[in-house]
From Swiss-Prot:
EC supergroup of this enzyme: transferase
Organism this protein belongs to: Arabidopsis thaliana (Mouse-ear cress)
Catalytic activity: adenosine 5'-phosphosulfate + ATP = 3'-phosphoadenylyl sulfate + ADP + H(+)
GO annotations of cellular component type: chloroplast; cytosol; plastid
Xref: HAMAP family: Adenylyl_sulf_kinase (MF_00065)
Gene3D superfamilies: P-loop containing nucleotide triphosphate hydrolases (3.40.50.300)
InterPro entries tied to this protein: APS_kinase, P-loop_NTPase
Gene encoding the protein: APK4
Protein's name in the database: Adenylyl-sulfate kinase 4, chloroplastic
Length: 310
């Protein structure tokens, strides 16, 4: 039987447990497969999948949830257009709502989007903020710009189109976290206003909280914790934000954290009346954001745990 015939016969299959192993032990290793219907005999042009150390040609991963030939109920009963093309995909409602999930964990889901130049302290603030929320009994998760490229976005380059897709994917995943009731902390350079605005538009009004790390370029370059500015100045990295690619600072974000050699750290919020801070401590930085969340009703119930954010 040729590959095309096999593809017609086999709709879906999964990697079964190895001989002698229990179903539950290998459950996490299941992968749905799809056989390619291509008849191209060129091995170099075919896709392959490695299973238990062996290469299987003309097989590729695919998403198991597909609406083709399925009748799925939706709120509108209409199919959805994706990228301008009609798809047999409709929304399926669930009786457990976002409000139900938020009531269960006693907090409101939202996205805290930390933006700024490389070396401005985005990841450090994200970790300190996550610890501060954890100490208050609040559930959060960090989507770090570097970390997501190890998995979710490992197929993307740093070309313009792929950088835009990187932001789009993180925005969509952050939206899902917020919908689950989790406080999602996304820390990415995200240099362009239009891309940050697109992510904001994914969420209900007020659930996208933009935090701008307003740190001067010369300060970030002096820190250069990853050596990226040095490589960019030497011409080894092209299109590096702040060197040969622009960073568009937010014009109307919720929180601004500024850092200068003379004044240390200060903060301002466009939507709250919290006083500014003059400490450069990570805990103080995290408290600026926590105070905003508290004042705007995202933290429904306080914890008596320590305020230590590290």
């Amino acid at each position: 039987m040729d590959v095309a015939a096999m593809a017609r016969c086999v709709g879906r299959c999964y990697v079964s447990p190895a001989f002698g192993e229990s179903e539950s032990h290998r459950l996490s290793e299941r992968r749905f497969l799809k056989l390619s219907s291509s008849t191209n005999s060129d091995p170099a042009g075919s896709k392959s999948l490695k299973l238990r150390g062996k290469i299987h040609r003309r097989m590729s991963y695919f998403r198991p949830i597909m609406a083709k030939d399925e009748s799925i109920s939706s709120r509108s009963g209409e199919t959805k257009q994706i990228n301008g093309k009609q798809k047999n995909i409709v929304w399926h409602d669930c009786p457990v709502t976002k409000s139900d999930r938020q009531e269960l964990i006693k907090q409101k889901g939202c996205v805290i989007w930390i933006t700024g130049l490389s070396g401005s302290g985005k990841s450090s603030l994200a970790c300190a903020l996550s610890r501060a929320l954890h100490n208050r009994g609040k559930l959060s998760y960090i989507l770090d710009g570097d970390n997501v490229r190890h998995g979710l976005n490992s197929d993307l380059s740093f070309e313009a189109d792929d950088r835009a897709e990187n932001i789009r994917r993180v925005g969509e995943v952050a939206k899902l976290f917020a919908d689950s009731g989790i406080i999602c902390i996304a820390s990415l350079i995200s240099p362009y206003r239009i891309e940050r605005a697109a992510c904001r538009a994914l969420l209900p009004q007020g659930d996208f909280i933009e935090v701008f790390m307003d740190v001067p370029l010369h300060v970030c370059e002096a820190r250069d914790p990853k050596g990226l500015y040095k490589r960019a100045r030497a011409g080894k990295i092209k299109g590096f934000t702040g060197v040969d690619d622009p960073y568009e600072a937010p014009l109307d974000c919720e929180i601004v954290i500024q850092n200068s050699r003379d004044k240390g750290l200060s903060s301002s919020s466009s939507s709250s009346s919290s006083p500014s801070s003059s400490s450069s401590s990570l805990c103080e930085m995290a408290d600026i954001v926590v105070s905003y969340l508290d004042q705007n009703g995202y933290l429904k119930k306080h914890s008596t745990k320590s305020r230590n954010c590290m």
